[in-house]
């Protein structure tokens, strides 16, 4: 296993309309590094100048308009730590999340760890810049960031607005959950 694993690098998605009326919209990970998928990690991915329409469901796991997830994957029911991939330099820029549905969630970021420590996992630089969230149906599910601090986690939100209000910290529009007690 893992012989064919190569990283996915330098992906640029620009000027797209993503209509997510049934499924997840833009998800980075979570299969990065799982050899059943043949991937070795994700580096230098940019999603810019896009519109995400009608995000329908965000009540569980990482169903959101914009999502970055690093988690352990199994191969036919067996888990191999050495096949988990790094996530580095992921940028969402100038994105409009419009007309969120009654169960929708704008953003989900998750780094999760199983029972034992992962060795060598990296997560560096996940950024959200100039994200506009329009919700005419009322706040449903907050954006959510959760960490197990597997190999470091840096997430930045710059000029992220919800119905015109800038999100500057946790509260009405954003939750942060730290599973390990180590991240801040």
Regions found by a protein language model. Give the residues of each.
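Extracellular/periplasmic carbohydrate-active domains that bind, remodel
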Residues: 1-184
């Amino acid at each position: 296993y893992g012989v064919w694993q190569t990283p996915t690098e330098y992906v640029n998605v620009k000027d797209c309309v993503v209509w997510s009326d049934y499924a997840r919209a833009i998800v980075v990970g979570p299969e990065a590094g799982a050899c059943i998928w043949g991937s070795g990690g994700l580096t230098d991915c940019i999603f810019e100048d896009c519109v995400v329409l009608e995000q329908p469901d965000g009540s569980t796991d990482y169903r959101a308009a914009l999502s970055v997830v690093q988690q352990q994957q199994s191969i036919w029911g067996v888990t191999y730590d050495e096949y988990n991939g790094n996530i580095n330099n992921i940028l969402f820029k100038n994105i409009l999340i419009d007309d969120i549905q009654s169960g929708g969630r704008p953003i989900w970021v998750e780094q999760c760890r199983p029972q034992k420590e992962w060795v060598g996992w990296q997560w560096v630089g996940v950024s959200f810049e100039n994200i506009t969230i329009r919700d005419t149906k009322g706040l449903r599910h907050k954006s959510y960031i959760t960490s197990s601090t597997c190999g470091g986690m840096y997430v930045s939100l710059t000029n992220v607005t919800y119905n015109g209000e800038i999100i500057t910290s946790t509260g009405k529009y954003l939750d942060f959950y730290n599973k390990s007690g180590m991240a801040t």
